[in-house]
Amino acid sequence: MLHYHGTPITPRSALATMTGRHFCVSFMAPNDLTWCLQHGASVMMDNGAFSAWTRGAKIDWNNFYDWIELNLRHPHWAVLPDVIEGDEEANDNLLMLNRLPREYVAPVWHLHESLDRLRKLADEWPRLCFGSSGAFATPGNEAWIKRIDEAWNVLEQTSRKPWVHMLRAMREASQGAWPFRFSR
């Protein structure tokens, strides 16, 4: 499993020792992006939705897409806009705004959403992110583990086997038998 190191990393001298690693740079805290693109193995550009949600802030998704388009190229990729604790319709509406090639981006399936939505996303996208939410907001607890098991059982039955990144649950993702590709 690839571990994406969340930024910003301070002090700056600590970041300088991490050449060749994988990084996650948020739209809400983009200061380390240039360094990470130049020195990292790959960069996951995060949409910043979780940070905005915790602060009660709104994100202008056009500005996000402008930021991504300047920097998106192989092997880097981006987490598409999502609504934390939103419903499936709100998240599907945001996916319709995507203007980037699918091989470079990943939609978020929130654990409180239906397994049918997960199946649909898996059939349509080469890469997905899982986000802990709702009754499954606490990574590692019994409900969360059961839901992750259910999700992987669904993915095993899909025609496409997308790469899956577990958002904000690196330790828990690595403790199970789940074949996550990435985590942070």
Feature map (PLM): residue ranges:
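Non-catalytic, usually N-terminal nucleic-acid engagement modules in DNA/RNA processing proteins
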Residues: 1-99
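Glycine-enriched alpha-helix->loop->beta-strand junction motifs that scaffold or abut catalytic
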Residues: 19-22, 39-41, 74-75, 100-104, ...
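Active-site-proximal loop/turn and secondary-structure-junction residues that shape catalytic pockets
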Residues: 29, 49-51, 84-85, 111-113, ...
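Low-complexity, flexible helical/coil segments
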Residues: 37-39, 56-59, 77-83, 115-117, ...
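Conserved, mostly hydrophobic/aromatic
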Residues: 46, 107, 178
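Catalytic cores of alpha/beta
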Residues: 59, 113-123, 169-183
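A general structural detector for well-ordered alpha-helical segments in enzyme core domains, enriched
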Residues: 60-67, 89-97, 117, 121, ...
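Glycine/Thr-rich beta-alpha phosphate-binding loop at enzyme active sites
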Residues: 104-167
